[in-house]
């Protein structure tokens, strides 16, 4: 598997970095920049957008991400995915302002084009 194999759109679900393990879902889009680094764009629920840049090696994808809250606070963190296949990513993450005793968890499943499903 190469970094190029990870480019695409994924359905995500996970739980937050809190004791309640509150759940979330959304979409993750992975693309490459001119240096073959991963560019990530998450759409969480209906109204939260997060972005990040990362790198891939030996089936591990690491992305430094950030987003802005409704109150204007910038949150930063890192997510680490184990690339089980080019279609399934299993990850965990942490934010600098999150509960230090907890980790967030996220799974990503590639969204296939209809024509891919028929072949």
Which residue ranges define each predicted feature?
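Central antiparallel beta-sheet cores of small beta-barrel/beta-sandwich binding domains
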Residues: 1-119
């Amino acid at each position: 598997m190469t970094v190029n194999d990870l480019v695409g759109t994924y359905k995500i679900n996970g739980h937050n970095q809190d004791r309640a393990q509150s759940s979330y879902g959304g979409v993750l889009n992975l693309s490459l920049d001119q240096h073959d680094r991963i560019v990530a764009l998450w759409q969480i629920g209906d109204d939260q957008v997060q972005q990040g840049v990362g790198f891939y090696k030996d089936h591990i994808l690491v992305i430094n991400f950030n987003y802005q809250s409704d109150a204007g606070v910038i949150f930063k963190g890192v997510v680490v995915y184990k690339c089980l296949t080019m279609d399934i990513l299993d990850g965990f993450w942490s934010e600098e302002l999150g509960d230090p005793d907890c980790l967030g968890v996220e799974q990503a499943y590639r969204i296939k084009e209809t024509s891919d499903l028929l072949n």
